[in-house]
Amino acid sequence: MAVGKEIRIKIASVRNTQKITRAMEMVAASKMRRTQDRLQATRPYARKIARIIKHLAQANPEYKNPFMVERPVKRVGVVLVSSDRGLCGGLNSNLFRLLLRRMRAWGEAGVEVRLGVIGQKGASFFGGVGADVAAQVVRLGDTPHLEGIIGVLKVMLDAYGEGEIDELYVAHNEFVNTMTQKPKLECLAPIKAEELSDELKGHWDYLYEPDAKTVLDALITRYIESLVFQGLVENNACEQAARMVAMKSASDNAGKLIKELQLIYNKARQAAITQEIAEIVGGAAAV
């Protein structure tokens, strides 16, 4: 029963792997729920800032913050949000394909692209293809904080403020539901006040201290930071959801493989028993 022994070893190995994938599925489900709660908490902050920015921009039309002025596009900056780890299906590869398509389109139009990368997978991939990576940060963990990405954001915001790039985008995965995550490329700058929150019907006039210009300058930076952080938290939720689905699929496939191996083992065992009976009967007949 040498063949039977090999099959039993394979079955035991697959069962051990199945235990690991089931545990990873449960961990990912728990992390996804926590990340969804964080995502819901970040959205009102960005919406409130957008509302104030629109109010300030409409109340002071003569002042144009550099982040609200459109200019000819010769250079583009993209903040890419990816995961640090794999085992999450095609989450990262789908996002990378979207960004590569846009980078090719920009390249054909003579537009240069500069990247600020968040996440190990994005840093490894775009570093490997020779992209212009101006800044990167990796290993932020499962509960990232804004302080962890400030360095990358400052590099990209300074580049925009100094005219080194003419448009700024953020690329991340959008959380639709547990089964669906969509790659998304969102424009951060220039900000178009008319496209911000439309909750200004019947609003009050406010007095700002120290003055409206200073408040607007500070809020625009905070607004862009909040959008990127929201994208980071959303991408984190997508990662955990994709990992949960991938590990469930792996566990299901392991179960199917165990059944197939068990069937092969039973057939091999049955054939061995039949062979032994035939040999015994043959020996008795010879006597």
Swiss-Prot record:
In the record, what terms sit under GO molecular function? ATP binding; proton-transporting ATP synthase activity, rotational mechanism
Q: Which UniProt keywords apply?
A: ATP synthesis, Cell inner membrane, Cell membrane, CF(1), Hydrogen ion transport, Ion transport, Membrane, Transport
Q: What topology in the membrane does the UniProt record assign?
A: Peripheral membrane protein
What is the annotated signal peptide range for this record?
none
- What SUPFAM superfamilies does the database record attribute to this sequence? ATP synthase (F1-ATPase), gamma subunit
Q: Which residues form a coiled coil?
A: none
What Gene3D superfamilies does the entry give?
3.40.1380.10, ATP synthase, gamma subunit, helix hairpin domain (1.10.287.80)
Q: Name one GO biological process term.
A: proton motive force-driven plasma membrane ATP synthesis
Q: Which residues cross the membrane?
A: none
Question: Which InterPro entries does the annotation name?
Answer: ATP_synth_F1_ATPase_gsu, ATP_synth_F1_gsu, ATP_synth_F1_gsu_CS
Q: What is its main location?
A: membrane
Q: Pfam families under this entry? A: ATP-synt
Q: Which family does it belong to?
A: Belongs to the ATPase gamma chain family.
Q: What is annotated about its quaternary structure and interactions?
A: F-type ATPases have 2 components, CF(1) - the catalytic core - and CF(0) - the membrane proton channel. CF(1) has five subunits: alpha(3), beta(3), gamma(1), delta(1), epsilon(1). CF(0) has three main subunits: a, b and c.
What this protein is reported to do is described as: Produces ATP from ADP in the presence of a proton gradient across the membrane. The gamma chain is believed to be important in regulating ATPase activity and the flow of protons through the CF(0) complex.
Q: What is this protein called?
A: ATP synthase gamma chain
Q: Which organism is it from?
A: Methylococcus capsulatus (strain ATCC 33009 / NCIMB 11132 / Bath)
Coding gene? atpG
